[in-house]
Amino acid sequence: MESIGIVAPQTMHFAEPLRLQSGSVIGNYQLVVETYGELNAARSNAVLVCHALNASHHVAGIYADDPRSTGWWDNMVGPGKPLDTNRFFVIGVNNLGSCFGSTGPMSDDPSTGQPYGARFPVVTVEDWVHAQARVADAFGIDRFAAVMGGSLGGMQALAWSLMYPDRVAHCIDIASTPKLSAQNIAFNEVARSAILSDPDFHGGNYYAHGVKPKRGLRVARMIGHITYLSDDDMAEKFGRALRRADGALDAYNFSFDVEFEVESYLRYQGDKFADYFDANTYLLITRALDYFDPAKAFDGNLTAALAHTQAKYLIASFSTDWRFAPARSREIVKALLDNKRTVSYAEIDAPHGHDAFLLDDARYHNLIRAYYERIANEVGA
């Protein structure tokens, strides 16, 4: 199926200060966005795609100067794809605090002329949603046909349906959770500790020292990456295979160098991530994950938290996802059904763990395609 082709990001500037959940204020900030497809005359066919931890506004297509720069959800978004850009106008927004062009720790603080670094305020999922709403306003979009996301993106989609109930017709929440478990918070803490203890971190102001805390960021990514894969998937991909340049496949080196294929894979993923991602951004986004808990203001009652929602919902989970297990999605489904909301739920039998939401699985894509067909009929797309 064809890609959407060459795309280009655009930078949107916002002069009105944004008050954050922490009480801090971000003034004169920018957000980088990409759009795909055409907004119809009624402005009724817009879909917002929210990104997960290490992704960005670059949802689909490629950049003219880099043919390898395929968007992170290119198999999902494009002409004739499950989210069909021949029918829908799709927006991807790079969130505040990120390192891909939107205002974040790498940006210059207007008050000092130096990068914010550790001074950049902690942001939350709710802060991102408020910022995204301003993007919608700038496009003249009063109501999204759908807000969609996987993992952390799914949390944003759910938050949209809570915070702007009259602006979301459909919420598509994939491989997500209503809040992080203690185990998930613990994984994030270990990852952050790896970064914070890196000698090159310099209290978050490493830009001024001309270094990056790559060692810590590398370990953080390795920890995270393990949680994105299933045990079965790792067994099939790597098993206990040894990595040997000399062809001696059955002998140990009796050292702490790379011995197993899975070690080599994790080191490769860690090195690649540390080259392009920012450590301060990693700290911010993992903390935003930790803080997301819409039921907190309702004494932990998710049903009460979702009482004022108006959207229709598609909730999807994957059988081997142990980071955000299907049981967590079913918590959302139950709370919505308790509120007599219209909910479709699917647990997809897929071997790939949490990362399955990013992959091209026929059953998964057929589900999303069928749901968008329903939305298209509603909005005349």
Curated annotation (Swiss-Prot):
Keywords: Acyltransferase, Amino-acid biosynthesis, Cytoplasm, Methionine biosynthesis, Transferase
Positions contributing to substrate binding: 221, 355
Domain called AB hydrolase-1: residue spans: 45-360
Annotated site (Important for acyl-CoA specificity): 323
Coiled coil, from the record: none
Catalytic activity, reaction form: L-homoserine + succinyl-CoA = O-succinyl-L-homoserine + CoA
Annotated GO MF terms: homoserine O-acetyltransferase activity; homoserine O-succinyltransferase activity
InterPro entries: AB_hydrolase_1 (IPR000073), AB_hydrolase_fold (IPR029058), HAT_MetX-like (IPR008220)
Record's subcellular location: Cytoplasm
Active site: 151 (nucleophile), 321, 354
Biological processes annotated in GO: homoserine metabolic process; methionine biosynthetic process
GO cellular component: cytoplasm
Family, per entry: Belongs to the AB hydrolase superfamily. MetX family.
Name of the protein this chain belongs to: Homoserine O-succinyltransferase
Species in which this protein is naturally found: Burkholderia vietnamiensis (strain G4 / LMG 22486)
